[in-house]
């Protein structure tokens, strides 16, 4: 019996989907249930293991689609510079290191060749990627973990060089299979099989897993692969995990519903799904009502929170007065800019206010510029990516401007540290973790997302909280809500669900 969890990618700034999987991995470990987490994306800029280990997965829990067909194990990068240099057919005549020591360039007597090695590790002692450049043109890249994992080969193209081939290796250096790329299409060539495209490669892997009725597939992301998974699960049971708002409210009326395109295939083929999993009871009830109203299908839907709390966290010393925080990817849909402007406005009435923003992402530069523009750098700070477990409880208030959260892991963690919350009155996370007037405030989202009204509403709510709320009562209310999300309760819910699925 194995529980296979299927996803696409993962990165340093992981989304709630990956964090939900990491929480699930902890629970399945505690239940002693074998689990594998499958990632189907290609990883070039970073070793997949560094991403998965960073978020809490164990190496033996990970399956990488491209690595599945080799005997190279999921592992951190430990291939040494000395090992690389031992493969050179001639000694370098010169070495140059970049200022940050993350790149070393080797020059040889043959002036037409140089080699770039991207380094990894605290002392940059390991090699992660190597580029071979001849006559100023890239011809090959090699990627390493504890051994060479795969190589990419390049040929001249209209706009410089273009990737034309990949070779994936076994531990002994032999080629396990090759990927031929042409016109952005891939053909995977094995000794006994050819797969035309990524979908056929995934199909090949699913067939090789020899899934039985004792196996369970949990489909977390399905973009581009949903149909392949549905058609190749064999006798295994299939559950689809809903991580976000599942429909478009603006384009839904009493006769027609517009499903979220990420879930449309799954919902259209709900008769082939053993269960759908939402993270909140509110979303479960709504989805049940919508299936009844808009379709003839009545699938099984269960609500299981995507995260849990090992324990409630209490401050070792007094929380910093007038302190606020948020934690999320610095992505446009998180609307951190609204929070910054709202805090800057509120600070004019409450000069003691401070606001710390945890997370990384593509919006960092814009947010930095906004802080400069508002002259807010002294009381609002971008703190970068941090493990927040022991950080929440040092603050007095949590802010969120997300307009949709399927669950909101940081919201759960915030109430688990006694933090009241201010955010929009929107499904599903905010409405699950905040009782407006008790442990924070829910703000009505204005039509058209009127920026000035939103900023003013956040400023007014922050002022109201710090001047009118009894903080001790609000904090206790958050702790009371968090009790329902303690680890042992979630373990039982997963245990019951899995047993029901496999025994059905």
Swiss-Prot record:
<dbReference type="GO" id="GO:0005886">
    <property type="term" value="C:plasma membrane"/>
</dbReference>
<keyword id="KW-0547">Nucleotide-binding</keyword>
<feature type="binding site">
    <location>
        <begin position="385"/>
        <end position="386"/>
    </location>
    <ligand>
        <name>UDP</name>
    </ligand>
</feature>
<dbReference type="InterPro" id="IPR001296">
    <property type="entry name" value="Glyco_trans_1"/>
</dbReference>
<dbReference type="GO" id="GO:0017122">
    <property type="term" value="C:protein N-acetylglucosaminyltransferase complex"/>
</dbReference>
<dbReference type="Pfam" id="PF22145">
    <property type="entry name" value="GtfA_EBD"/>
</dbReference>
<comment type="pathway">
    <text>Protein modification; protein glycosylation.</text>
</comment>
<comment type="similarity">
    <text>Belongs to the glycosyltransferase group 1 family. Glycosyltransferase 4 subfamily.</text>
</comment>
<dbReference type="GO" id="GO:0018242">
    <property type="term" value="P:protein O-linked glycosylation via serine"/>
</dbReference>
<keyword id="KW-0963">Cytoplasm</keyword>
<keyword id="KW-0328">Glycosyltransferase</keyword>
<keyword id="KW-0808">Transferase</keyword>
<keyword id="KW-1003">Cell membrane</keyword>
<dbReference type="GO" id="GO:0016757">
    <property type="term" value="F:glycosyltransferase activity"/>
</dbReference>
<dbReference type="InterPro" id="IPR054396">
    <property type="entry name" value="GtfA_EBD"/>
</dbReference>
<dbReference type="GO" id="GO:0000166">
    <property type="term" value="F:nucleotide binding"/>
</dbReference>
<feature type="binding site">
    <location>
        <position position="243"/>
    </location>
    <ligand>
        <name>N-acetyl-D-glucosamine</name>
    </ligand>
</feature>
<keyword id="KW-0472">Membrane</keyword>
<comment type="function">
    <text>Required for polymorphic O-glycosylation of serine-rich repeat protein Fap1. Catalyzes the first step in glycosylation by transferring N-acetylglucosamine from UDP-GlcNAc to serine residues in Fap1. Part of the accessory SecA2/SecY2 system specifically required to export Fap1, a serine-rich fimbrial adhesin encoded upstream in the same operon. The GtfA-GtfB (Gtf1-Gtf2 in this bacteria) complex adds GlcNAc from UDP-GlcNAc to Fap1, attaching the first sugar residue. Cannot use not UDP-Glc as substrate.</text>
</comment>
<dbReference type="GO" id="GO:0005737">
    <property type="term" value="C:cytoplasm"/>
</dbReference>
<dbReference type="Pfam" id="PF00534">
    <property type="entry name" value="Glycos_transf_1"/>
</dbReference>
<protein>
    <recommendedName>
        <fullName>UDP-N-acetylglucosamine--peptide N-acetylglucosaminyltransferase GtfA subunit</fullName>
        <ecNumber>2.4.1.-</ecNumber>
    </recommendedName>
</protein>
<comment type="subunit">
    <text>Interacts with stabilizing protein GtfB (Gtf1), probably via the N-terminus of this protein; probably forms a heterotetramer with 2 subunits each of GtfA and GtfB. Part of the accessory SecA2/SecY2 protein translocation apparatus.</text>
</comment>
<feature type="binding site">
    <location>
        <begin position="405"/>
        <end position="408"/>
    </location>
    <ligand>
        <name>N-acetyl-D-glucosamine</name>
    </ligand>
</feature>
<feature type="binding site">
    <location>
        <begin position="16"/>
        <end position="19"/>
    </location>
    <ligand>
        <name>UDP</name>
    </ligand>
</feature>
<dbReference type="InterPro" id="IPR014267">
    <property type="entry name" value="GtfA"/>
</dbReference>
């Amino acid at each position: 019996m194995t529980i296979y969890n299927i996803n696409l990618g993962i990165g340093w700034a992981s989304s709630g989907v990956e964090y939900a999987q990491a929480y699930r991995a902890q629970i399945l470990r505690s239940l002693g249930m074998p689990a594998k987490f499958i990632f189907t994306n290609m990883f070039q800029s970073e070793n997949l293991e560094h991403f998965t280990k960073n978020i809490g997965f164990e190496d033996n829990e990970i399956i990488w689609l491209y690595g599945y067909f080799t005997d190279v194990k999921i592992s951190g990068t430990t291939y040494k510079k000395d090992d690389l240099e031992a493969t050179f057919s001639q000694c370098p005549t010169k070495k140059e290191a970049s200022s940050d020591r993350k790149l070393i360039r080797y020059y040889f007597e043959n002036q037409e060749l140089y080699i770039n090695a991207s380094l990894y590790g605290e002392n940059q002692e390991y090699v992660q990627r190597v580029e071979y450049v001849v006559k100023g043109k890239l011809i090959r890249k090699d990627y390493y973990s504890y051994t060479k994992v795969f190589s990419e080969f390049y040929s001249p193209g209209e706009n410089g060089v273009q990737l034309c081939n990949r070779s994936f290796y076994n531990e002994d250096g032999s080629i396990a299979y090759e990927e031929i790329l042409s016109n952005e299409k891939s053909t995977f060539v094995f000794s006994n099989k050819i797969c035309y495209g990524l979908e056929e490669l995934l199909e090949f892997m699913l067939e090789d897993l020899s899934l039985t009725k004792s196996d369970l597939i949990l489909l977390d992301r399905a973009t581009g692969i949903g149909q392949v998974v549905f058609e190749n699960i064999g006798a295994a049971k299939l559950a689809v995990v809903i991580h976000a708002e599942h429909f478009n409210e603006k384009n839904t009326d009493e006769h027609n519903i517009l499903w979220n395109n990420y879930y449309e295939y799954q919902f259209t083929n709900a008769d082939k799904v053993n269960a759908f999993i939402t993270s909140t009871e509110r979303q479960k009830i709504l989805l049940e009502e919508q299936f009844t109203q808009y379709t003839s299908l009545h699938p099984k839907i269960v609500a299981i929170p995507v995260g849990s709390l090992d324990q409630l966290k209490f401050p070792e010393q007094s929380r910093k007065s007038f302190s606020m925080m948020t934690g999320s990817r610095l992505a446009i849909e998180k609307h951190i800019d609204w929070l910054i402007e709202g805090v800057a406005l509120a600070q004019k009435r409450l000069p003691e206010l401070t606001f710390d923003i945890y997370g990384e992402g593509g919006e960092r530069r814009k947010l930095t510029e906004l802080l400069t523009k508002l002259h807010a750098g002294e009381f609002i700070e971008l703190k970068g990516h941090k493990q927040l477990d022991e950080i929440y409880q040092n603050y007095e208030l949590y802010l969120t401007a997300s307009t949709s959260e399927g669950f909101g892991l940081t919201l759960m963690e915030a109430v688990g540290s006694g933090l009241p919350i201010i955010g929009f009155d929107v499904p599903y996370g905010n409405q699950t973790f905040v009782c407006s007037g008790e442990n924070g405030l829910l703000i009505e989202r204005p039509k058209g997302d009127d920026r000035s009204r939103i900023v003013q509403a956040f400023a007014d709510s922050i002022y109201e909280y710090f001047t009118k709320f009894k903080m001790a009562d609000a904090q206790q209310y958050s702790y009371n809500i968090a009790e329902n999300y303690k680890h042992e309760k979630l373990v039982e819910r997963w245990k019951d669900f899995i047993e029901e699925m496999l025994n059905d």
